[in-house]
Amino acid sequence: MEKTIGLEIIEVVEQAAIASARLMGKGEKNEADRVAVEAMRVRMNQVEMLGRIVIGEGERDEAPMLYIGEEVGIYRDADKRAGVPAGKLVEIDIAVDPCEGTNLCAYGQPGSMAVLAISEKGGLFAAPDFYMKKLAAPPAAKGKVDINKSATENLKILSECLDRAIDELVVVVMDRPRHKELIQEIRQAGARVRLISDGDVSAAISCGFAGTNTHALMGIGAAPEGVISAAAMRCLGGHFQGQLIYDPEVVKTGLIGESRESNIARLQEMGITDPDRVYDANELASGQEVLFAACGITPGLLMEGVRFFKGGARTQSLVISSQSRTARFVDTVHMFDDVKTVSLR
């Protein structure tokens, strides 16, 4: 899969990022998301595959494009599919977030990016549009920290695994009222907290790379983004755990479903019989081969944002593979017109 469509999925996230970046700082988050979705879908439909969106922009009746269950790729066309020799059709599941951190893009803040994860059919967990308690940590702490332990306990373990004093550790937490006690506990334990307004996929992935000064992600965020983060962390060999949150009282904000009971019923309809189960990266991204791709929209810890010049743009992308165990940073100059001078800055 990496050899057949690896480069093309980079182009998919690049096109989404360029489209969103044109609206960076204009305060139009919905429009930034819409153009990213459209650009991603157009390029995705040029890839020689039969893809199925398992995590996208919502249910079919809620989203016009990249909705859950939508087929994408050249072979979504039954006539073209019929001409493919037996056993040669590439069927994949796809999780997308065309503009991760729409507010970050809209207000020109760092950390917005276009992301997707792919695996063979059945290889990605079809997470409901609920919330998820998450714990991400570097590879050295894999299997040692645990989402069921307190933040204080996990910080002690992290300190030992990384051979760092606790006061040298940085934990990323989303700036939400629900995290007030978590933030207090982390600070009382001696670690430092980096609060983010949006974009916890970037924060989770940063835990997998040395030199980002990000040592853990803790707290509750969106479940679909949790699956995308898990796919990346599986490829990187990092630690990721997620637990679905179905009680509105826990997140102190709206959820699909009006009550704890209705949310449990919805999970059961989806075949999730144990709503309190803790999933690791291998369960959320269980496929034999998993690929993750991202392209910076605004500058972040890992990638530069889109930089426009007269007649073109420059992007920085990341593609991570579970099969080759590689993380490739791709620097691309896009020439829109007949450009006489190509900017390398």
Curated annotation (Swiss-Prot):
First-level EC class: hydrolase
A Pfam family per the record: FBPase_glpX
EC numbers, comma separated: 3.1.3.11, 3.1.3.37
Keyword Metal-binding set for record: yes
Cofactor (UniProt): Mn(2+)
Origin superkingdom: Bacteria
NCBIfam families: glpX (TIGR00330)
Known role: Catalyzes the hydrolysis of fructose 1,6-bisphosphate (Fru 1,6-P2) and sedoheptulose 1,7-bisphosphate (Sed 1,7-P2) to fructose 6-phosphate and sedoheptulose 7-phosphate, respectively.
Name recorded for this polypeptide: D-fructose 1,6-bisphosphatase class 2/sedoheptulose 1,7-bisphosphatase
Lineage of source species: Bacteria, Bacillati, Cyanobacteriota, Cyanophyceae, Synechococcales
